[in-house]
Every structure is written in C-alpha cells, then in structure tokens.
Amino acid sequence: MIRRPPRSTPKPSSAASDVYKRQVSIKTPITFATNMTAKINNEVYLKREDLQPVFSFKSRGAYNKIISLTPAQKKKGVIAASAGNHAQGVAFACKKLKIPCLIVMPVTTPDIKVRSVKNFGAKIILEGDSFNQAVKAALKIAKTKKIEFIHPFDDQYTIAGQGTIGQEILETDEEYDAIFLPVGGGGLLAGVSAWIAQHTKKVKIYGVEVEDSACLLEAIKFDKRVRLREVGLFADGVAVEQIGKNNFDVIKECVDGVITCLLYTSPSPRDATLSRMPSSA
C-alpha cells in the first residue's frame, strides 16, 4: 500500500488525553533494544505498553470509548467480551469511573485471567467456547439490558484512544524511520497510523501479522474485509477472523504495508526480546 493523505481518520479527542489524568493509562517510555539491535544490525526501540496498569495498551481505547457515553449510558453500565487484555482495560476504566461493568469471557479462559478482571470489580459471565461465541452472548445481553457494548477494536473512539500511542512516539526527540505494529482486529494499527499520517510523512507504518491469522493481508488482497475460516491460536492476542470495518477504512489510507511472519522461523530476534522483556510484554 502507498500511504495517501487520510480523507477521514479518527483524531484522539481532548478526552483521550484525560486517560493520563485519571491514571487509567500512563505515557509509557520508549527503550532502546540493545540485544535485538545487535542481532539484526538495525536500531530497534520498544514502546513499553507492558508498563501500563493493565499491562497492555487496551486501557487507552476502552477508556476513550467509555467516557464518550452519555451520563444515562454510564449509569446503566457497560458490557464487553474478551478473554484477556480488553476485559482488563474495560474493567479498570469502569473502576476509575465508578461505572457498572459486565464482562463475558469464554469458558476456556484461564482462571488467572478471570481473577485479574474480577479484581477490578467487574462482574464475570462465562459463556461460549470461543471469543466469537462470547461476543454473541455479550451482544444479546446488551440488547436485553439496554446497556452499551464496548467493542475491542471496531469503534472510532477506541481507535482514537489507541492513537495516543502515536502521539507519544512523535513527542520524543528520536527520529524513527518506521513503526511496526501487531495486527489483530486493527484497532492499534488504525489509531497509531492515523495520528502519524496526520502529522508527518517521514515515518513509515507497517502492520505485522502471524501468517496463520493474517486477516488484514487477505482484506488487502481482495480490497474488502474477508473472514478467515480458521485462525492460529498460538498468538491468541491477535487471533482475529476478520479485520474491523472502521479499522480497515483507516488502514487503507494510512498504512504503508503489511508484513506476515512465521512462528519461530527466525528465533534469534525473538530470543533477544524475551531476554530483556517481562513475560507480559
């Protein structure tokens, strides 16, 4: 893909910056990856989103979506479906905002993840054997209870919240040639690429997918969103069958390319990362 000036891309609203005030999210550091740089002979930097209170970037988008709701919607509470990071992001944001929170998690979710979400005060419902089944259950409950469903990636406010990462990257003194972002449903890639594209043409943006879960690559091939028949589950955090609609609209305009990779094909850079990063990174 060739990056063009975005026609209509989400801008992190002034509300997005409020995530720092309530400490739902923090401005994370960018660290020089010494071992990985030596391994591949290129300077590599890591955006340390593992240092967030919920150990991932998901709290940014979740909070930005939730604060966009009306007072009446907030009073009723929200519901989300997730087996991990999104669940924690929504639950933590709701705790800070004192909003009722209901999370639907697949029955296969490890107990440790269920407990971590409960610790933020969310009510848990175990339903379905997969993420998609949990989503269907959550949407049904949302309709019955007339409460807002917080989508993990396919939402303009969520996308804009994730885009604050791009804002932080450009605030540093370092000049970067390219930014590489993992792709699941596309929320992170859409948000960061939108911000970068609006503020500079010097930095290339690439999405990175595992080959057996490459829903974005397939969408680009056919110039429309494609639902994968099956996805690999080793990298379960990015195992998504179909790229988000709002996400794909932004990505087509703002991203320079997509890279797919095989698991363990080149273990050395991975080993170099693991030797310097905590397991949650």
Model-inferred region functions:
Residues 5-20, 267-271, 276:
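Short, small-residue-biased leader/transition segments that mark boundaries at the very start
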Residues 1-2:
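Right-handed beta-helix
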